[in-house]
Amino acid sequence: MKKHLLILFLTLFFVACNSIKKTQEAIHKGNYDKAISLAVRNLNGNKTKKKTQPYILMLEEAFGKASQRDQEEIAFLKKDANPENLERIYNIYLRLKERQQKIKPLLPLKISKKKANARFDFKNYDEAIITLKKELSNHLYSKAKALFASNHKYDYRKAYEELKYIEEINPNYRDTRVLMQEANAKGIDYVYVSMKNETAQVVPKKLEKDLLNFDTYGLNDLWTVYHSKRDTEIRYDFGLSLNLRKI
């Protein structure tokens, strides 16, 4: 019995040491968010225990370094003044907020040796996020509208992706939904499929219908639609012939 308890104790000890080592390594390699996730996981439900003190110190360090790095990157990108950086800046602000939200439920975190709480310089990023969301939506909307002018299917598809992202971050922005439908309609490749009977037998109507029922195969997707009957109002982009040689 004592032997089993000793083995269990040693196993738990090595697991704890390994987790601390992984968190330290993540910080040293600059993987601050990984270190934060590891520390938070080990502090959940255990933050007052002595064995979790190293995680509090590492969490404080990783958070400070991660926030500083993100703020420096934002400052650089803003100085560059390139509208293509708006999405990157927006996502960094989201990351800053998400990081704080991950730590907040654990507070306060007391550092025993200092007899004080760990310090986390939390900031309110809501205004910055809302402002960036508006600027980014406007920028992507303008890009999408410009792509419409080219009248090429590939550009309509690119416009659709820009509009789709706007819809994700800023639902129902201007006429985004209407433009998405238009971009999709104009970006589709239509394929006309015909069947040639080479069997020297009469193909049963039901079999022919089943073979040309493309919904069954799941071939149609966002940008490709197959037709077995010609639509006079559609200009087909591709033709496909099915040669039936054996029934």
What is each PLM-predicted segment?
Residues 43, 47-139, 143:
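Post-signal peptide N-terminal segment of secreted/secretory-pathway proteins
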Residues 35, 88-89, 159:
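Single-residue signature of alpha-solenoid repeat helices
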Residues 12-34:
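Bacterial Sec signal peptide processing site at the extreme N-terminus
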Residues 194, 225-247:
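A short, hydrophobic beta-strand-centered structural micro-motif
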Residues 4-13:
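Sec-dependent N-terminal signal peptides
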Residues 116-139, 143-194, 199-201, 206-209:
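Long amphipathic alpha-helical scaffold segments
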Residues 27-28, 78-81, 148-151, 168:
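Hydrophobic/aromatic side-chain positions at a characteristic register within alpha-helices
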